[in-house]
A protein has these predicted regions:
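Terminal amphipathic alpha-helical/low-complexity segments used for targeting or macromolecular assembly
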Residues: 1-69, 176-182
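Left-handed beta-helix
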Residues: 69, 74-75, 80-81, 86-89, ...
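Short aromatic-enriched loop/helix-cap "lid" or pocket-rim segments at secondary-structure transitions
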Residues: 172-174
Length: 182
């Protein structure tokens, strides 16, 4: 399991690539000053405290994240390295959610349970502003969820979900791939 410091480094490396197009030291430092940086660090500290069974500290980091960053990430939620909270305001994530590496979340995103079932997110996911992912759905590796989409069904790897309720769209093919597919 990666250390707290290495996980946070990877979070900001990914955020620097997202925001500035590279992961240079300067870009990583700038990424640490962006919206969502405080929420990311508080979430990682909460996760670290939970693994060490430091419940009072875990609760403190959870409540600080909600009060200071308006970001509610359930205490049991697990995300791999490279979590990017583009803007943390209004993010709500159920404590049973599992997410892979390099998950990118915009503001006002809800990832929650429906009748006790929770979503599972793969690696390299993007979730647009205001999107809702609810229930026992799987979001495959490299999938995208459009802004304000309400996802109630699985999104296969590389596909995009848009609309209310969300409709899954296949990935667009580049020019040469389109001709070969025809």
């Amino acid at each position: 399991m990666p250390s707290l410091v290495s996980t946070i480094r990877e979070d900001f490396r990914c955020k620097a690539r997202w925001c500035y197009g590279d992961a240079s030291r300067r870009s990583r430092l700038k990424a640490m000053l962006t919206d969502g940086a405080c929420a990311t660090i508080l979430y990682r500290l909460m996760q670290w405290s939970r693994r060490r069974r430091l419940v009072p500290l875990e609760l403190l980091f959870n409540k600080l994240n909600a009060a200071l960053c308006h970001c509610v990430i359930g205490r049991g939620a697990e995300f791999g390295p490279g979590l990017v909270l583009i803007h943390s305001n209004g993010v709500v994530i159920n404590g049973a959610v599992r997410g892979g590496a390099r998950v990118h979340l915009e503001h006002q995103v809800t990832i929650g349970a429906e009748r006790g079932d929770v979503p599972l997110l793969g690696d390299d996911i993007f979730v647009g502003a205001g999107a809702r992912i609810l229930g026992a759905v799987t979001i495959g590796d490299g999938a995208k969820v459009g802004a304000n989409a309400v996802v109630l069904c699985d999104v296969p790897a590389g596909h995009t979900a848009v609309g209310v309720p969300a409709v899954v769209k296949a990935p667009r093919l580049a020019g040469d791939q389109r001709r070969e597919a025809a």
